[in-house]
Amino acid sequence: MRARGLQNATLAAVCGLGLLLTACGGLFDGGDPKAGYSCLDDSPECVEQRQMRLKAMLADKDRAWVRDAPTPQAHASGVRLFAFRARKKELSCEELAHGRREADGAAKSLRGPDGQGLSPAQISRASMFAAEVSRELSTEMRARRCKA
């Protein structure tokens, strides 16, 4: 009887570990260009995943991420918006305009059908941050006299 209890406890521990490791799927997959966008909780694993994604975006000399189509999850994670904010001095006028349009459309995207599953708090935080980033990008565009 005792051996069976130990076996059940071991099985439960292994299953729990498996669930923990898959909670933020793709954490250890560096090849996924969208990694860091869908893991939205504040667990250490998700925070690390978002940080890794942001570092990869900032290291991209071609800034190919600027033209990627964002998802509501990407807006909610804040990764793309942080990247636009961090690189605003280096972006071309065209890239700044693209970033501003993306930030301006974030609130609508977050509240749309693809944003289902996001909490009201996530939507609110991401919408406020997007508005802040939009203002910063607009200020940068005016300072450089970029055409809207």
Where are each of the predicted segments found?
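C-terminal motif of bacterial Sec signal peptides marking the signal peptidase cleavage site
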Residues: L20-A23
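Bacterial N-terminal signal peptides that target proteins for export
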Residues: R2-V14
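Extended, charge-rich alpha-helical interface modules
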Residues: G25-A148
